[in-house]
């Protein structure tokens, strides 16, 4: 059976209604997800519990822990990664000083995509054949793409971060989510069931594939959303903004989901306002990149506090650069989780500002990316 069988729209409609909706959510969260986690030899739920414990701590304590983690990460990189062993060893860098003097971090040279491409395996702490790993290629929206290798622990942390952030936005694992993806001409229709289908069931997730944002394409998207009725929708803001404009023109307003999670490109204020008003949903923003995963999120559920930087996942900086317009600063990150390929002071290519407040670090004035279909 192929995934375009005519029975599936009916099954989608059925799974979006009670009591099937609740039964499916409970089965996904408490049966399918643990089974999938065990089959894939992942350890996500334990790391999710760690994140909940971490963010219950006062910010001053979290900041102290982040500084210790920063020093530990740099020390590990100097000991295990050939590139850092040579680069930082040549300047006599002492990572222990970071525990008491965070300004000393400025002595570490910035890491760029060019350096990652040039150095290759010299940025790895061990050969890829020695441990499970996940290869991720950057999209190239902020320069030429490069390859990042994640170890198992880092991949599990990245998955746990997404679950934690969505929980803060009001979405539990029992509630369904929908992801937007492009459909290209000539793409074959996949068979059903597949490994991806079980993965989606375990995560209580479905995908929606679209090829165009014309009136017919937007009508198809809206009809699918009405059938499935997900709690959270994840996609590019430009796509959902186009949908909001179409619904406003044809219906005035409409509601098919509770939360829109913006990702992949910069969401402008006018887009956020239109989406919230027309589609009658809460809008949450997040910032992430292939090199590091999700690094900032509207942890207050999109209620106005802004994107909070995840101090558990890395050290964040914003630095003035000569080529940045209007005094913007470039975002620079040091990753804490990925011991296979630790990135120290990595230049993201994105512009924004790191702002310290009483309750955390926040990402403001972001100038991001735009994706065209």
Q: Where do the protein language model's features map onto the residues?
A:
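Active-site glycine/GP-rich loop and adjacent strand/helix microenvironment
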Residues: 1-60, 68, 75, 200-373
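Nucleotide 5′-phosphate-binding alpha/beta core
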Residues: 1-137, 144-159, 163-175, 227-234, ...
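Positions that flank functional sites
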Residues: 92, 154, 181, 240, ...
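Short, flexible, solvent-exposed loop/turn segments with mixed acidic/basic and small polar residues
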Residues: 136-137, 197-198, 251
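Conformational gate/switch positions in structured elements
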Residues: 142-144, 173, 289, 351
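A short secondary-structure junction signal
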Residues: 148-150, 189-191, 245, 343-345
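Short, well-ordered, mixed-charge alpha-helical segments that flank or form enzyme active sites
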Residues: 156-158, 184-190, 242-243, 268, ...
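Conserved AMP-binding loop of ANL adenylate-forming enzymes
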Residues: 163-199, 208-211
């Amino acid at each position: 059976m192929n995934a375009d069988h005519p029975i599936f729209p009916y099954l989608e409609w059925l799974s979006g209604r009670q009591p099937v909706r609740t039964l499916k959510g409970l089965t996904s969260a408490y049966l399918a997800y643990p089974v999938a986690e065990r089959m894939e030899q992942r350890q996500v739920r334990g790391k999710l519990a760690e994140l909940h414990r971490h963010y219950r701590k006062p910010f001053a304590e979290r900041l102290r822990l982040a500084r210790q983690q920063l020093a530990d990460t740099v020390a590990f990189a100097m000991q295990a990664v050939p590139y850092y062993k040579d680069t930082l060893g040549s300047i006599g860098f002492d990572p222990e000083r970071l525990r008491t003097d965070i300004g000393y971090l400025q002595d570490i040279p910035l890491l760029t995509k060019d350096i990652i491409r040039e150095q290759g395996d010299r940025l790895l702490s061990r050969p890829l054949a020695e441990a499970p790993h996940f290869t991720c290629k950057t999209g190239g929206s902020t320069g030429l793409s490069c390859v990042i290798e994640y170890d198992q622990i880092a991949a599990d942390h990245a998955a746990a971060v997404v679950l934690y952030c969505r929980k803060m936005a009001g979405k539990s694992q029992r509630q369904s989510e929908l992801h937007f993806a492009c459909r290209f001409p000539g793409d074959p229709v996949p068979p059903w069931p597949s490994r991806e289908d079980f993965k989606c069931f375990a995560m209580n997730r479905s995908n929606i594939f679209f090829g165009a944002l014309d009136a017919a394409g937007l009508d198809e998207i809206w009809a699918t959303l009405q059938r499935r009725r997900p709690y959270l929708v994840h996609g590019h803001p430009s796509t959902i903004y186009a949908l909001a404009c179409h619904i406003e023109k044809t219906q005035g307003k409409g509601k098919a989901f509770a939360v829109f999670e913006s990702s992949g490109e910069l969401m402008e204020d006018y887009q956020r306002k239109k989406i919230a008003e027309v589609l009658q949903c809460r809008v949450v923003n997040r910032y992430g990149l292939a090199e590091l995963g999700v690094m900032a999120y509207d942890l207050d559920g999109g209620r106005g506090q802004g994107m909070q930087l995840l101090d558990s996942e890395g050290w964040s900086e914003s630095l003035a650069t000569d080529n940045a317009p209007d005094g913007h600063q470039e975002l620079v990150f040091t990753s804490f989780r990925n011991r296979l390929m630790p990135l120290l002071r990595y230049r993201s290519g994105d512009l924004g500002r790191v702002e310290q407040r009483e309750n955390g670090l926040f990402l403001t004035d972001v100038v991001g990316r735009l994706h065209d279909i």
